Amino acid sequence: KQFFQTGNNLTNAVALSGGSEIAQTYFSYTNTDARGVEPENKLQRNNFDFHEVAKFLDNKLTVDGNVNYITQKLNNSPAIGFYSNPLTGLYFFPRGMNIAPYKNYQVPAAVGGNGAPTQNWPFIEDVQQNPWWIINRNTNEDDRNRIIVNVAVKYDFVPWFSLQVRGNVDRTDDDGDQKYWAGTLAPLAAPNGNGSWNGFQQTLQQEYGDILGNFVIPVSTNLKIDGVVGGSITDNVTSGINFGPGAGSGYGLFFPNLFTIQNIEVAPAVALGGTSGSYGSNVRTDQPYHNQVQSVFGNANVSWKDMIYLTLSARNDWSSNLAFTPDDHYFYPSVGLNFILTKMLSLPQVISFAKIRGSYSQVGNTASQYQTNPVNTASGSATVLNGTAPSSLKPEQTKASEAGFDARFFNDNLTASFTWYKTNTYDQDISIVPLSASGYSSGNVNAGNIQNRGIELTVGYNLINHGPLTWNTTVNYSKNVNKVIDIDSKDGINLVDLTPGNNNYDTYVSKGGQYGDLYVQTLEKDAQGRLVLTPDGNGNYFPVQGNGELNGYSDVGNPAPKFQLGWNNSFTYKNFNLNFLLDGKFGGQVISVMQGMLDYYGVSKVSGQARDKGYVSIFGEDQTTGKTVTEIDPKNWYTFIGGRNATLGQYVYSATVVRLREAALGYNWVVKGSAVKSVRLSLTGRNLIYFYRKAPFDPELTSSTSNSLGGVDVFNQPVARNFGVKLNLLF
């Protein structure tokens, strides 16, 4: 309570529209001013949107233009993990001490030092710092300017054919930095104690253009054909510079807390992987990237008596990322078929509508950039890096099949929708280090056949649908089964580590398993399931580390749920409306590195309870005598299983969670005889109540947007309960 604050998000928007039959104009402005639950975490955003549509030549020519401009400033984006994260010091702080004096996060410079203030904190270790020091002296800032311009020109030559040309430019300029002030502990700041500074300036620009021929052919009264043929080009350019030695590089600032490029230490090339005697600089690094995709495509929709619908599509892409390979292009078709049973068959009157559907599709994806030919990379020295990939890389391909039905009953009061699907993704682009027998340090290969199979079911019913009161309830059910059919058998690769270098866990893709299976260290057990214990010589015991099946680690599950269930209810009564959504994810496993460290430091609730009792209850076996042991010393237990290298097999939790996801209450006023036509006031809430949760954190939170870190808690940000008020005025 002494550190966190109440976050808020204030959004104001105004929109104007007007026009005639010939031209329509739309303009809007949205301002967002937000602050997070951590102090100094702020976001400011302005969004301007202008849209104009005009028709000429007896409405045959349509010109459509849109400009969207966004400015954004983000300060102190919250961190996860051990470093630059105020939660570590906050959570590790002893419960018997008063943290309030440390809000004064810095103290005057020490005699004989560099003259810079130092950090006011009683503990010296790399995984924790003063929380207020981090938010004020380990600051980060990101400024963004983005402009999106869309132009489309369409001409209707005849009633059944039109030609359209479209163009789009999307440019984003980012300018950001991370400052580590003198007094910050290693490895974030330089060993010389003067602090460090890292920054970047980056521009991403995408240019897109296409030409489309749209046709509608009424072959007969019963048979209709419509579709589109065309081609497109997408060009992406990324450029920018980075400056600064980087946290943990061993280099920093010449003079303390002077954040200028001229004050950044220059590292010798040998420190950057170059050769002895060469010159280098880690002040600036150019990052030019350029790729292009050229495409031709077409699709056709055929309908018969508005009861049978056939959809066909085909697309071929040529990608610059596949240059120097035998297959620089990839073709992917699709087909879909729908039958409207209520028009084809004489069904009971209770069936208002019934449709069955099925489809098959292929989707292609290009390889990673600059992976098909050796390139010279400037990395602060004259050294040419030797990472590459073979010229036999192929595009990734996903094949998907789907079938289902949609139905409505009792005058549309009861609705049901069901979908079965199966997807297989082949030839995924993965990095292999080292790339054996190639002469290069690393490279990419095509690998994998990852399958997803599942079902989705939605059932809704209007329980009350007459008079001033209505009530609609909807239930959603979904289930997905993931399986790694193959990785790269032809090259003898049956396992890929997605998280190499982690302290005490790994996520793997292994043949026969699921994507992102969690592997951790576990404790050894005997045939009866008892923990194997070794005496400590003082009448107590230590557990014994197990020998996992993969590099000492054991498979403890996957964070993906077995199934998901949601229940939504919507009520209206005159001008009032109420909505609430309950949902749950059932099954799966997650792990908490944070809980292991809190236990090790003795600041968790369970470690405190164990100290009060004087023991931890276990089911173990003395490996020297074979006798059953039911109690173990808390210090021996938590110092062995906890800490940064925790035995995470003891910190595996069910990922099942059931919550009141959101609720909203609104009221509408209709105003007469005023410039204001209507007023709507809404009260909203999200993450309101947990009905069931066993994990010490929200299982839906991840340590990264990467798929490889799902279900892993490494001092993730706490979940916030959100309340909102929204006012809409229509003039």
Model regions: which residues?
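Conserved small-residue
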Residues: 1, 79, 234, 241-256, ...
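Surface-exposed loop/turn segments flanking beta-strands in extracellular/periplasmic regions
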Residues: 1, 83-133, 181-195, 239-282, ...
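Outer-membrane beta-barrel transmembrane domain signature of Gram-negative proteins
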Residues: 1-17, 21, 146, 181, ...
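Outer-membrane beta-barrel transmembrane strand signature
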Residues: 1-17, 22-30, 104-156, 269-299, ...
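Transmembrane beta-barrel strand/turn architecture of Gram-negative outer membrane proteins
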Residues: 20-107, 141-175, 196-244, 314, ...
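Extracytoplasmic gating/loop element in the C-terminal half of outer-membrane beta-barrel translocons
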Residues: 186, 319, 585-680, 685
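C-terminal beta-signal and terminal closure region of outer-membrane beta-barrel proteins
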Residues: 382-383, 447-452, 497-530, 603, ...
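Membrane-embedded beta-barrel scaffold of Gram-negative outer-membrane proteins
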Residues: 395-439, 478
